[in-house]
Regions:
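Hydrophobic anchor at the beta1->P-loop junction of P-loop NTPases
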Residues: 5
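NTP-dependent small-molecule kinase module
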Residues: 111, 124-164
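Short, solvent-exposed loop/turn segments at secondary-structure junctions
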Residues: 10-11, 57-59, 98-100, 144-146
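A glycine- and Lys/Arg-enriched "phosphate-lid" helix/loop adjacent to the NTP-binding pocket
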Residues: 68, 82-130
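Conserved beta-strand scaffold positions in the cores of enzyme catalytic domains, especially
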Residues: 26-28, 52, 92-94, 136-138
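Walker A (P-loop) ATP-phosphate-binding motif of ABC ATPase nucleotide-binding domains
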Residues: 2
Length: 164
């Protein structure tokens, strides 16, 4: 079982990833800005089984603009990685929430990077566009608890698995 949870900061990815990992008996891998973010890194990460990824390749298509840095992947590389992940049965989900909720959640954390706070509308819009482009289920977490979101994801995964 491999699950990728993507989305804007403050949408509940980490909380949902932990619940899913407990449910499926998986590890959580939290990908961060310190990871290499190149083609080999994402390709090799697929070697791990029984994992819930808290962020993965989609973030590399969003955050270079936010942090004013060079992209580490070419568009065709990210397309290839996502296609291959899906071919291998990786379950992708994009979490969204309304802008105000994301900001409130991030403010409660404290110490959030100002570049993220000032770019929430862009980050949300970009993740929504990527979910549409890659046909990835999008779940709005604005009025849902992490438990409820995890249950929705489990239901989608079970329906997919039963179709095989």
């Amino acid at each position: 079982m491999r699950i990728v949870i993507e989305g804007c900061d403050g949408t509940g990815k980490t909380s949902v990833a932990k619940i899913l990992a407990d449910h499926y008996g998986c590890d959580v891998v939290h990908m961060t800005g310190d990871d290499p973010k190149d083609f080999d890194f994402y390709w090799q990460s697929l070697r791990k089984n029984n994992v819930v990824y808290d962020r993965n390749v989609l973030g590399e298509l969003v955050y270079p603009y936010v942090f004013d840095r060079k992209k580490h992947l070419k568009d065709e590389q990210s397309d290839g990685i996502i296609s291959f992940y899906k071919h291998k049965g990786v379950h992708f989900f994009v979490l969204t929430a309304n802008e105000g909720i994301c900001k409130a959640r991030l403010m409660m954390r404290g110490n959030e990077d100002q570049r993220i706070l000032s770019n929430i509308p862009y980050i949300l819009a970009k993740f929504k566009a990527l979910a549409f482009e890659y046909n990835i289920p999008e779940i709005n977490t604005s009025q849902r608890s992490a438990d409820r979101v995890a249950k929705e994801i489990i239901k989608v995964i079970e329906e997919k698995e039963n179709k095989k």
